[in-house]
């Protein structure tokens, strides 16, 4: 069997799951230059295939594996909601299986992205670009964008599953998995070859469109080197640092840090000078919006002053357990063990952080705060209140930084002291919610879903370089790089607790990664790089100390489809 036959099966299965389709659309059995490629637009239609898949791939199941398995985010059972046969428990406790849908969908999505990129490359290689009003430089750019996005999908596969089957064409016969080192080398070659042929951003703040430019491909190569210690057991931090310095220095295009904390995430973030690669999103067109229903309460539309009810699922990992504290407008994000002592990953060292406010839309594209926490009355219209529908039916929801069955005190439990705080103990008001992508109100409803999803931004380059400097022993330089980003989070840049050579260690570095990139789908990878993913405790998670869990299992369905594929150790 050839790879393209697997593609057909995958695409067919995906079609059955699609929410809608155009039954009048015409399809052709094959794409040939004389029947399809008659204009420049036709080449972009083919180039877009893997990028459309990438837009879907960035969210949902991949995000779950990166965030809900870590100290950052969690999806507890809330009464009768969100148990889902224990699949979210398995993420939190690291007891997933080869048949769990998040694992299956991620493996299929990864290989599907690779196959779509290879298929598009095969179609475009035979096109005479000059004959349709383009030129050879544009063709080289297109082909190498496809090489770069192929490398992206292979790197995600390497991160999630280890060595992947390596294909060069959709006509290749099915093959066994290559080793992690071979997969790493393949990714490196694809990116090194692609970078020189890609276009370069020359205007600061020019709108990003989702396509891959030189800086994006260079950043992907930097990521590969950055995580080499986890991927292949070798340190390549020096190579990563060199690329990061070049990106910051403008070698691969014109970028700079945004002057505000919200710039990379706002309604017009496609023009932020910081964004390097984004998933485009625009109201009523191509909308990137999967996250909304999963994060927010059933009635959160009242708080936001907008339509659309939520599913009330995901939340920041709780820090208060069963303690009833005073009002908190910050999130003590996580507690893990540090050398036998409790250590908090939190915002408490930065109480003047401009992000540490309840989210509020101010009108005219402006907003403040990054969290839903506390009383969920609309701050702009007190008559709109987020009312409970379950344990707190008819009452204004008060989101708390804790998980426990407080509604059952006096009935099932005599006092708060008897409560437990586990994945089974959530209520509808449990947990602080993240608002990384802003929401307008009905007056500005056409702005909804306009924020693009930033996949790579310059802050990440600064942080990668900082960690490389830390590992090289230059804590002062590392601290300076982090502080260049941190400063914008405080009024007038007055950071009450900047990073210094004295307070910077592996835990503070991980802390800074989480605070800046909270909810951006990278936490698992950062923990693995520091050997913390399977060795540390947080909230209801006890470490298994099983390094096999740094990788997910190959789905049984993938092994059944290709019996040359072997399972990962420990599964």
Locations of the language-model features?
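Bacterial Sec-dependent N-terminal signal peptides
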Residues: 3, 17-41, 151, 187, ...
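Long, intrinsically disordered, low-complexity segments
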Residues: 20-23, 82, 97, 110-113, ...
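An aromatic- and glycine-enriched ligand-binding surface/loop that stacks and positions planar moieties
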Residues: 22-85, 192-193, 215-404
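Short coil/turn linking the two alpha-helices of tandem helical-hairpin repeats
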Residues: 156-160, 165, 202, 227-233, ...
């Amino acid at each position: 069997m050839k790879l393209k036959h697997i593609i057909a099966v995958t695409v067919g299965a995906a079609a059955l799951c699609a929410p809608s389709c155009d039954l009048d659309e015409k399809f052709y059995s094959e794409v040939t230059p004389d029947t399809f490629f008659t204009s420049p637009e036709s080449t972009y239609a083919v180039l877009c295939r893997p990028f459309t898949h990438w837009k879907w791939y960035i969210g949902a199941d991949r995000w779950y594996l990166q965030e809900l398995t870590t100290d950052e985010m969690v999806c507890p059972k809330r009464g009768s909601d969100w148990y889902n046969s224990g699949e979210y428990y398995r993420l939190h406790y690291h007891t997933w299986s080869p048949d769990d849908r998040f694992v299956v969908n991620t493996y299929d999505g990864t290989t599907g992205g690779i196959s779509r990129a290879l298929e598009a490359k095969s179609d475009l290689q035979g096109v005479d670009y000059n004959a349709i009003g383009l030129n050879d430089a544009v063709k080289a750019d297109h082909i190498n964008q496809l090489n770069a996005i192929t490398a992206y999908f292979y790197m995600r596969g390497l991160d999630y599953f280890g060595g992947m089957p390596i294909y060069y064409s959709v006509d290749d016969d099915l093959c066994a998995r290559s080793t992690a080192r071979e997969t790493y080398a393949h990714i490196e070659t694809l990116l090194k070859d692609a970078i020189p042929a890609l276009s370069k951003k020359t205007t600061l703040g020019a709108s990003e469109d989702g396509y891959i430019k030189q800086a994006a491909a260079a950043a992907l190569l930097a990521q590969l080197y950055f995580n080499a210690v986890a991927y292949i057991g070798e340190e390549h931090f020096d190579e990563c640092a060199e690329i990061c310095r070049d990106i910051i220095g403008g070698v691969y295009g014109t970028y700079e840090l945004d002057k505000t904390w919200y710039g990379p995430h706002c309604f017009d973030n496609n023009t932020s000078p910081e964004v390097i690669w984004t998933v485009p999103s625009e109201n009523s067109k191509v909308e990137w919006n999967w996250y909304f229903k999963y994060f927010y309460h059933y009635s959160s539309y009242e708080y936001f002053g907008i339509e659309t009810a939520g599913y009330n699922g995901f939340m920041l990992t709780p820090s208060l357990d069963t303690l009833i504290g005073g009002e908190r407008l910050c999130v003590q994000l996580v507690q893990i063990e540090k050398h036998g002592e409790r250590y908090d990953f939190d915002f408490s060292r930065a109480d003047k952080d401009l992000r540490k406010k309840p989210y509020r839309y101010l009108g005219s594209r402006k907003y403040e705060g990054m969290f839903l926490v506390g009383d969920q009355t609309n701050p702009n219209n007190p008559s709109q209140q987020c009312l409970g529908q379950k344990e707190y039916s008819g009452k204004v929801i008060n989101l708390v930084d804790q998980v426990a069955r407080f509604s059952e005190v006096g009935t099932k439990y005599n006092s708060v002291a008897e409560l437990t705080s586990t994945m089974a103990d959530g209520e509808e008001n449990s947990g602080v919610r993240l608002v990384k992508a802003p929401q307008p109100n009905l007056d500005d409803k056409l702005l909804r879903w306009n924020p693009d999803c930033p996949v790579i931004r310059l802050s990440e380059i600064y942080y990668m370089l900082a960690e490389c400097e830390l590992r090289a022993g230059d804590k002062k330089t590392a601290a300076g790089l982090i502080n260049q980003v941190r400063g914008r989070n405080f009024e007038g840049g007055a950071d009450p607790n900047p990073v210094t050579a004295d307070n910077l260690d592996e835990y503070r570095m991980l802390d800074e990664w989480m605070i800046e990139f909270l909810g951006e789908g990278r936490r698992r990878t950062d923990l693995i790089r520091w050997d913390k993913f399977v060795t540390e405790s947080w909230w209801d998670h006890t470490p298994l100390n099983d390094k096999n869990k740094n990788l997910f299992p190959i789905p049984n369905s993938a092994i059944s489809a290709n019996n040359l594929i072997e399972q990962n150790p420990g599964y």
